[in-house]
């Protein structure tokens, strides 16, 4: 039996990529940091698109919506995550020319810390509400069909 909750494994892969990105920042490897963040962004955007185009319509139509589980909450968080990644990319491109690099890097890492808390909050909502409810309201055939339409999947432990 397959579960839609298996798609949450991608979150671990994204976390690994983001960790590698932050490690590159700490070593002043700004091109590598940007490249890793772009890879992270690709996975994140694809995952968001899968959720918004494939999974959330089913959830919106059939789920028993509990506190904290309104479909709009997930959409709003997706928007915030996408906007944050855009900001981080923009700021990383400025780092090589930054006259006060230490201050700017600390500022950027603070922003990334906030971003990670937002990601953790969003992951918790998906782990505790969205995916368990999707697993509950879909049949085996529906799960198979939905999984066939999902486009994003890293091979866990090979993300970086």
Spell out what each predicted region is.
Residues 1-160:
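Small-residue-biased structural context
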């Amino acid at each position: 039996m397959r579960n839609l909750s298996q798609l949450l494994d991608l979150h671990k892969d994204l976390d690994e990529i983001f960790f590698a990105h932050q490690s590159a920042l700490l070593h002043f490897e700004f091109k590598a940091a940007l490249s890793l963040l772009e890879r992270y962004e690709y996975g994140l955007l694809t995952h968001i698109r899968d959720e918004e185009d494939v999974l959330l319509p089913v959830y919106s139509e059939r789920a028993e919506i509990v506190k904290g589980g309104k479909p709009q909450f997930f959409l709003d968080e997706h928007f915030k995550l996408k906007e944050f990644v855009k900001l981080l990319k923009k700021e990383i491109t400025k780092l090589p020319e930054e006259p006060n690099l230490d201050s700017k890097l600390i500022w950027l890492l603070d922003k990334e810390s906030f971003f990670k808390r937002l990601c953790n909050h969003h992951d918790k909502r998906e782990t505790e509400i969205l995916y368990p409810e999707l697993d509950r309201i879909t049949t085996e055939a529906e799960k198979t069909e939905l999984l066939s339409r999902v486009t994003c999947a890293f091979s866990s432990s090979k993300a970086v």
